[in-house]
């Protein structure tokens, strides 16, 4: 694997030659769009891991959301869900609400209720996985990577420390390597700075926010009508983490998490951006879903 200085680029030699013919995507919009996909409902389980108690919370369940950013100069998928599309297809359950049991490599079990494949939701918006320009994951945990392999032909925007951990011989807990194994051969832009301006116009920015994982990042989207939005990955899981100032026990570095949250608070005040907590079940339920979009 060849690396290049600065923003490291790891070429995927077969991306163009092996890509299958697909339907043409919709014409590029005149202004930025943000699509929200329903990628399931994750049962929270033991919330003491988040230093919370059930009686302090509106719900212990979490939404699992994925997002598509459509820019006049390209597209970006943000996070890839918890249940692989292949599991839904194998159960012949696309369009049917079904509870899935996920078993992680360390033997831990998680339960997610999902209804539709990510591919079918993309298709409803007019897109296919192999037509997406960029893939960016907030971080490497299983409930954000389930369909990452679908986007192996996209350019992967990732921080080196995160990528290295994903392909270690013994990856950290809460990873599901089979869901992202194809990314090993993907074209990579390795982000070495705090911010990465995806389309070079300030409207779509990946911001470093380490702590939950070493290379965790959040997504800033500057929408013309909706206004600026920060989609925060797992910097917070529950809104009560924010209001009660609780940090999960399993974060890689709690001091980094606290610093990242403080830095984001400053950024939110400076920009007036809304904070979208991806796992906030109640808030996510109120968001319009694809094929509707925010602009």
Regions found by a protein language model. Name each.
Residues 19-131, 159-208, 226-233, 256-274, ...:
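Metallo-beta-lactamase
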């Amino acid at each position: 694997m060849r690396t290049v200085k600065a923003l490291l680029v790891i070429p995927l030699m077969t991306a163009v030659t092996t890509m299958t013919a697909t339907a043409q995507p919709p014409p590029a919009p005149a202004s930025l769009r943000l699509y929200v996909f329903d990628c399931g409902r994750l049962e929270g389980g033991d919330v003491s891991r988040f230093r919370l108690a059930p009686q302090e919370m509106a719900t212990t369940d979490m939404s699992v959301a994925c997002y598509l950013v459509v820019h006049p100069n390209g597209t970006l998928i943000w996070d890839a869900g918890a249940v692989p599309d292949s599991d839904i297809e194998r159960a012949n359950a696309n369009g049917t609400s079904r509870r899935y049991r996920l078993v992680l490599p360390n033997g831990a079990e998680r339960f997610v209720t999902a209804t539709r494949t990510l591919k079918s939701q993309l298709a409803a918006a007019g897109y296919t996985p192999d037509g997406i320009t960029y893939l960016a994951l907030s971080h490497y945990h299983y409930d954000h990577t389930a369909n990452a392999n679908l986007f192996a032909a996209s350019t992967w925007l990732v921080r080196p420390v995160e990528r290295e951990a994903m392909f270690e011989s013994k990856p950290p807990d809460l990873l599901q390597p089979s869901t992202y194994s194809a990314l090993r051969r993907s074209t990579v832009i390795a982000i070495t700075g705090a911010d990465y301006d995806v389309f070079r116009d300030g409207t779509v920015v990946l911001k470093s926010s380490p702590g939950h994982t070493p290379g965790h990042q959040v997504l800033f989207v500057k929408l013309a009508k909706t206004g600026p939005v920060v989609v925060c990955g797992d910097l917070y899981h529950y809104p009560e983490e924010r209001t009660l100032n609780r940090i999960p026990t399993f974060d890689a570095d709690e001091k980094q998490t606290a610093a990242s949250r403080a830095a984001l608070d400053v950024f939110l005040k400076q920009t007036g951006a809304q904070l979208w907590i991806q796992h906030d079940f109640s808030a996510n339920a109120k968001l319009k879903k694809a094929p509707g979009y925010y602009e």
